[in-house]
C-alpha cells in the first residue's frame, strides 16, 4: 500500500483512493493520540535523545514512524536513535531491520546478545519463557541506553497492553496496578516512556497493513499460545465486540482514581477520617440507587472514546507539539 501513498492521484483507481484516504485519516488519528499522550505525561522535552526500542513487530514500527513524523512538527529539537536487540532466536532475519532503518536514514544500533540460549537452558521445556526473557532484555537495553547517551527509552506498548497488564495484576496478583505511560527504570537511571499509551491495538494492526512494515514474527522462540496475557487480551477484544466502549471505560478509570472510595490505607487516611461539617463532592454514595449499566447515571465522561475526549480544553493547553 505504500505505492498508493506515493503515486499521483490521477493514477489511482477509486478503490485505491479510498484506501489512501482511510490510511491518511488513520495516520492523523495516531499522530494526534500519540501527541496527546506525550503532552499529558511530558514524555519528550527539548534536547532529549530518545531511544526507540525496535523489535520488528507492528507496535515498535508504528512508534518509530510516528515519532519521526512528529519530530518534523515539534517546536523544539530532539534526537531519535533506533535500537534492536538480536537475541539469537532461531529463524530471526538479521538483515531486515538494518535494511529498513538504513532506508529511513535514522541512526540505529543493533545489539547482539544470545539471551535465547540462556533462557532455554534455565527454563524447563514447556514452561513460559517470557518473564526471564523480558528481564534479560530489559537489563541489556538499560545498559545500551547509557552507552548511547539516551535520555528517554521509548517502548511500543499500547492501550490494550496497559489494560491487559491491569487485569493480569488484578486477577493473578491481587493488586490494582497497570503499565504507566512514564516511569523511572528499575535501576533508577533511565526514564521509560510509552507514547502509544492512548492508541488501541486495532489501529496499529491497520496502520502496519497500510504502511507495509516488514514485520518479523514474534513467536520465533516458540512461545506458548495459552499465556495468561493472551487470554486476557482475548477477553478485552470480546468485550469490545459485545459491549463497545467498555474497554475505554476501564482504561479511563485508570486515570480517575478516587482513593477515598477504595481500601488502600496508604493512599487515604481512613484512620484519621472525621466529619468536617462541609459537603464533599466525593462523599457517601453507599445508599444511592446507582445502576452502573444505566447510561443516565453520570457516565458521560467515562464513555469518552479516548482519554483526551473528556478533557479537550485542557489538552489544547498542554500539547507541546504543533497541531496536526
From Swiss-Prot:
Substrates-to-products reaction catalysed: cytidine(32) in tRNA + S-sulfanyl-L-cysteinyl-[cysteine desulfurase] + AH2 + ATP = 2-thiocytidine(32) in tRNA + L-cysteinyl-[cysteine desulfurase] + A + AMP + diphosphate + H(+)
Which UniProt keywords are given for this protein, alphabetically ordered?
4Fe-4S, ATP-binding, Cytoplasm, Iron, Iron-sulfur, Magnesium, Metal-binding, Nucleotide-binding, RNA-binding, Transferase, tRNA processing, tRNA-binding
Q: What is its EC number?
A: 2.8.1.-
Q: Which domain of life is it from?
A: Bacteria
- Going by the record, the broad EC class of this enzyme is transferase
Q: Which residues bind [4Fe-4S] cluster?
A: 130, 133, 221
UniProt KW RNA-binding keyword: yes
Q: Which residues cross the membrane?
A: none
Indicate the secretion signal residues.
none
Q: Which cofactor does it need?
A: Mg(2+); [4Fe-4S] cluster
Q: Which Gene Ontology cellular-component terms appear in the entry?
A: cytoplasm
What quaternary arrangement does the UniProt entry report?
A: Homodimer.
- Known HAMAP family for this protein? TtcA
Q: Which family does it belong to?
A: Belongs to the TtcA family.
Identification of the protein by name: tRNA-cytidine(32) 2-sulfurtransferase
Point out the gene that encodes the protein.
ttcA
Amino acid at each position: 500500500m505504500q505505492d498508493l501513498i506515493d503515486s499521483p492521484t490521477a493514477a489511482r483507481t477509486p478503490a485505491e483512493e479510498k484506501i489512501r484516504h482511510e490510511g491518511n485519516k488513520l495516520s492523523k488519528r495516531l499522530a494526534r493520540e500519540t501527541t496527546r499522550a506525550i503532552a499529558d505525561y511530558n514524555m519528550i522535552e527539548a534536547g532529549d535523545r530518545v531511544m526507540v526500542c525496535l523489535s520488528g513487530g507492528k507496535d515498535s514500527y508504528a512508534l518509530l514512524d510516528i515519532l519521526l513524523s512528529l519530530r518534523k512538527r515539534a517546536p523544539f529539537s530532539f534526537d531519535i536513535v533506533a535500537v534492536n536487540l538480536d537475541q539469537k532466536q532461531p529463524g530471526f532475519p538479521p538483515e531486515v531491520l538494518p535494511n529498513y532503518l538504513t532506508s529511513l536514514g535514522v541512526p540505529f544500533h543493533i545489539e547482539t546478545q544470545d539471551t535465547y540460549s540462556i533462557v532455554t537452558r534455565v527454563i524447563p521445556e514447556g514452561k513460559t519463557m517470557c518473564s526471564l526473557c523480558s528481564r534479560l532484555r530489559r537489563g541489556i537495553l538499560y545498559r545500551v541506553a547509557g552507552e548511547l547517551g539516551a535520555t528517554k527509552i521509548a517502548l511500543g506498548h499500547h492501550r490494550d497492553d496497559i489494560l491487559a497488564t491491569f487485569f493480569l495484576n488484578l486477577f493473578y496478583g491481587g493488586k490494582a496496578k497497570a503499565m504507566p505511560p512514564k516511569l523511572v527504570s528499575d535501576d533508577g537511571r533511565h526514564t521509560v516512556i510509552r507514547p502509544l499509551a492512548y492508541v488501541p491495538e486495532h489501529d496499529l494492526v491497520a496502520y502496519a497493513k497500510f504502511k507495509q512494515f516488514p514485520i518479523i514474527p514474534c513467536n520465533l522462540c516458540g512461545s506458548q499460545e495459552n499465556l495468561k496475557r493472551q487470554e486476557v487480551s482475548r477477553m478485552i477484544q470480546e468485550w469490545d465486540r459485545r459491549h463497545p466502549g467498555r474497554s475505554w471505560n476501564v482504561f479511563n478509570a485508570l486515570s480517575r482514581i478516587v482513593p477515598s472510595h477504595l481500601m488502600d490505607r496508604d493512599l487515604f487516611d481512613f484512620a484519621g477520617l472525621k466529619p468536617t461539617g462541609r459537603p464533599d463532592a466525593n462523599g457517601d454514595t453507599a445508599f444511592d440507587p446507582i445502576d452502573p449499566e444505566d447510561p443516565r447515571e453520570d457516565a458521560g465522561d467515562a464513555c469518552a472514546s479516548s482519554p483526551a475526549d473528556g478533557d479537550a480544553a485542557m489538552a489544547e493547553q498542554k500539547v507541546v507539539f504543533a497541531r496536526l
